[in-house]
Amino acid sequence: MFPFQPMYPMQPMPYRNPFAAPRRPWFPRTDPFLAMQVQELTRSMANLTFKQRRDAPPEGPPAKKPKREAPQKQKGGGQGKKKKNQGKKKAKTGPPNPKAQSGNKKKPNKKPGKRQRMVMKLESDKTFPIMLEGKINGYACVVGGKLFRPMHVEGKIDNDVLAALKTKKASKYDLEYADVPQNMRADTFKYTHEKPQGYYSWHHGAVQYENGRFTVPKGVGAKGDSGRPILDNQGRVVAIVLGGVNEGSRTALSVVMWNEKGVTVKYTPENCEQWSLVTTMCLLANVTFPCAEPPICYDRKPAETLAMLSVNVDNPGYDELLEAAVKCPGRKRRSTEELFKEYKLTRPYMARCIRCAVGSCHSPIAIEAVKSDGHDGYVRLQTSSQYGLDSSGNLKGRTMRYDMHGTIEEIPLHQVSLHTSRPCHIVDGHGYFLLARCPAGDSITMEFKKGSVTHSCSVPYEVKFNPVGRELYTHPPEHGAEQACQVYAHDAQNRGAYVEMHLPGSEVDSSLISLSGSSVTVTPPVGTSALVKCKCGGTKISETINKAKQFSQCTKKEQCRAYRLQNDKWVYNSDKLPKAAGATLKGKLHVPFLLADGKCTVPLAPEPMITFGFRSVSLKLHPKNPTYLTTRQLADEPHYTHELISEPAVRNFTVTEKGWEFVWGNHPPKRFWAQETAPGNPHGLPHEVITHYYHRYPMSTILGLSICAAIVTVSVAASTWLFCKSRVSCLTPYRLTPNARMPLCLAVLCCARTARAETTWESLDHLWNNNQQMFWIQLLIPLAALIVVTRLLKCVCCVVPFLVVAGAAGAGAYEHATTMPSQAGISYNTIVNRAGYAPLPISITPTKIKLIPTVNLEYVTCHYKTGMDSPAIKCCGSQECTPTNRPDEQCKVFTGVYPFMWGGAYCFCDTENTQVSKAYVMKSDDCLADHAEAYKAHTASVQAFLNITVGEHSIVTTVYVNGETPVNFNGVKLTAGPLSTAWTPFDRKIVQYAGEIYNYDFPEYGAGQPGAFGDIQSRTVSSSDLYANTNLVLQRPKAGAIHVPYTQAPSGFEQWKKDKAPSLKFTAPFGCEIYTNPIRAENCAVGSIPLAFDIPDALFTRVSETPTLSAAECTLNECVYSSDFGGIATVKYSASKSGKCAVHVPSGTATLKEAAVELTEQGSATIHFSTANIHPEFRLQICTSYVTCKGDCHPPKDHIVTHPQYHAQTFTAAVSKTAWTWLTSLLGGSAVIIIIGLVLATIVAMYVLTNQKHN
């Protein structure tokens, strides 16, 4: 038949039914949304396939059996093949006996997956069930020679040897443990602390491990699985399951595991339930029974089943009871098991619609509520009609059924239209809820046409697209980045939210009343009852009937009212429906299409064009959508900015050496650091020096230049004044004496003519001929003054730059203490000098530093939902409010609301018609997915992930920075901490929302205010201790229709989401990175970490075994200061022998990149270093020898870099020698002028005084 042999044997053809099934009706498809429908269908099918395994397909014809097996299958001996097959078919389809029926209820075992097979094989002799009353209540497993069993699991281990062991209790970990006998230790599990992120195996398949949490798909694992092990691919136990909690589409597991030190740790998510198989009991007529096994079910006794559900509505096992009541025992499960079918307990209803085609009306498709809180553009509606059920209450997809004056009718869902400003696309419906995707609009309208009548209902609601992320886009992009968001689930999974139901009240149905002759006849529907009230003349009739009855006293239909009564169906507890008389039986059903965590594609704005300047960055922005730009400084004061950019713009920012960060839209953060660079040349001419230091230190440079200018000005002015004063004092006596002869020296000093010498040359000639000593003194005085001033200035003004020593360079024999900066990625190198031993190098690099605060959850807040009871209406009588016990519940009695025979109640009285209105507050249906958590933060613990190298031994370890907890590796004992700075970015009160942390001073529990954060508060998402304060006020209803009007403050949670500032992720100081699960800050560049080493002797090397240098010379080949290892030093040496030597700089002038170098007997070694000094001069230690390295460094060329500098940033660049030379020269010239003036003044004064005494 085939030209080749198939690789695998062909499967038998499936069984074909000879009777063709009726063809399904064809419905036209909606072309514009075809791609969307295919995508949603694929997603739904994937969910169903992943979360449950479908039933096996119908069996095909039996495969061809070997001849030796044929006699065993033939019971009649001489029957042929056809007869044999007919016998099989008959045996399969015939009426089974009770034993066979009980056996058929059991599904055939499905073939487990690869992971399950592996775990089952390993569990067979290492895991033992714990039995309680004949049922498996949990499991115990043997790991590492010890028996572990959960402490909350009661019962006896199904092994005589293990059951006889005496166990010890560890209540902190919810475990009991004991040592197993020696003969059983060979067949035990091995455990491991290695847990890389990925998938692991347990009894039910795959377990995902991510961010320190184990999760499984929802529905996988349940009560009775406590104690089961989770294994890796090598069959080692990584955790033991204790319980779980549903979180949307996933279930988080509570587990016990081991850390790197082999210490047991326990992780328990919030609201976790223990998975011991404890039977939940329910109540019926004062008789208890297991909730999963009710004595009645809905298909057999509907009214009694609803009453049973109402009694147990607050029972923890209500979901089990509801599921069992809907699926009667003995019924075969179908592939739609995951889709709850509980809405067959309800029926549609007619309610008042505020806006129909013309005014208000009593509509079969009244819209009760509209929600659009997701980020995917979908809308969830709650209506009075129902979806997924036909008129008989059976499951039927893509169908809507509605109530038309007591008659339930159905219509295909594609004939129902929904639109806002434009038509919507209806995705699916379930129960009272409809999921659709709608364009933006201020109202939403639903309508359908039946025959020639069009039914419609509109409600005001602003439908808009809610973008996620930091760009305000209006339509999902085709390409972009994936970001966590909240989307409406497209399935009817049980996610823990409920909608309240109750038995419907009496509803007027005029179609039940007819006129037969001159009498009124009331005919109730088959199987239902009707309440008849008539007022005929002076006769009042009030009677309940279940079959047609004629009332001869009444001759007009208007004299009677017929109310339909139904106690076998629930309806939604709507304020548009009247409440049933007496005690109303309430229930609750699950809400489909809830918000769930998902991934959304968000747009990426065009990358900004970045221009770097001197300590500045310029961003040229071109957003396509309004985009947020957030910046912060990575210093102690973040000085953050947060701006929404809608148009092309240019923004300029200052960048410092401590760093600067900006976040543009949905792009990841980018960080920049400034380098110590500037124009000019610190080793050049004066104007180049001034330009360089003006850009680096503008204020200091201006101040220094101002001081120098003032000194020069004062010097010139003082010298001039002194010279003039001396000249006047010297010449005045001679000017007052007639014919006085002025001495030659005085004439020269005072620039005055003598009687004998007319010119300067004549004066010098006179001194040369008459007094040569004075001649040489006159010439040497200025030169001597210049020499003296120059020497004085050299001693006074030559300032040595101040450098701070970073830390100790050596240590004692066994112990070494040092301090390293608390900054991730920056290496710290040092050596340990010990007498008689070679220096031991130590290198430490922190890869990550975590700061984890101790937090206490105060409460959870979210959107609130206003619950309204159907109003209790009493005609011809009064009512009172019953005591209130629900959150923010309001109750009020209104009298005279409904007039005689008109309005919603159709009362027969004109007065004393009362209505009791009740409203209260509850958590929204989507509170589980969309909520904020208010925490109080306390003392924080610090963890440092260090890469440590001691000598030639390296290790990556985690250290608790508390000064107490040591870490041991290769015999080295390391103790870190405590931090030099007790600092945390978290305030005392913090709020966690959508994976981000906010410092927010929230109100205390029980002190919330309307319209503000905390207006509703609950201790946990699932707890029932709800506090609410929403300013709920009931208003008087109008007579036209039954309703409960009210006013209420807007949601404080929603207002807080609109007004909240940027989270700590964008505003934390010191460049902290903020994360959740657990709440923590990482890589905060603040403070320093003290380290204490205790090093064993084995790691030291004798000095005789290491080389020694006989000659060494260091030259700086290249040096760029304030740059990442921008210096290169070459050391030429002669060594005693080849070997490896530690290198170190004892001072803090330079930071070396290398911790050790390889030496030969003669050669050179190249060493890279970083320095912040313009003229570095440091001693370099190589083994036990020292060599001095010095030279000049130039500023870096790049103004801005994308990584922090790996040198000690506490050192600032010193003033260059060239600058000191120019400054000394400037100040020296000014001082010479002053000293010359002082010398002249002194000589003149001495001469004048001597001359006066002589005279």
Curated annotation (Swiss-Prot):
SUPFAM superfamilies: E set domains (SSF81296), Trypsin-like serine proteases (SSF50494), Viral glycoprotein, central and dimerisation domains (SSF56983). Residues 112-126 are annotated as: Ribosome-binding. Glycans are attached at N286, N652, N947, N1083. The record marks Y200, N233 as: Involved in dimerization of the capsid protein. The record marks W275, S276, R334, S335, A757, E758, A813, Y814 as: Cleavage. It catalyses: Autocatalytic release of the core protein from the N-terminus of the togavirus structural polyprotein by hydrolysis of a -Trp-|-Ser- bond. Residues 276-287 are annotated as: Functions as an uncleaved signal peptide for the precursor of protein E3/E2. It holds the Pfam family Alpha_E3_glycop. It is an enzyme of class 3 (hydrolase). The modification Phosphothreonine is found at T93, T127. Residues 276-701, 758-769, 813-1225 are extracellular. Residues 44-119 are annotated as: Disordered. Residues 730-750 are annotated as: Transient transmembrane before p62-6K protein processing. Residues 723-757, 791, 1247-1255 are cytoplasmic. Residues 91-127 are annotated as: Binding to the viral RNA. Structural polyprotein: As soon as the capsid protein has been autocleaved, an internal uncleaved signal peptide directs the remaining polyprotein to the endoplasmic reticulum. Belongs to the New World alphaviruses that can cause fatal encephalitis. Structural polyprotein: Translated from a subgenomic RNA synthesized during togavirus replication. This is Structural polyprotein. It comes from Venezuelan equine encephalitis virus (strain P676).
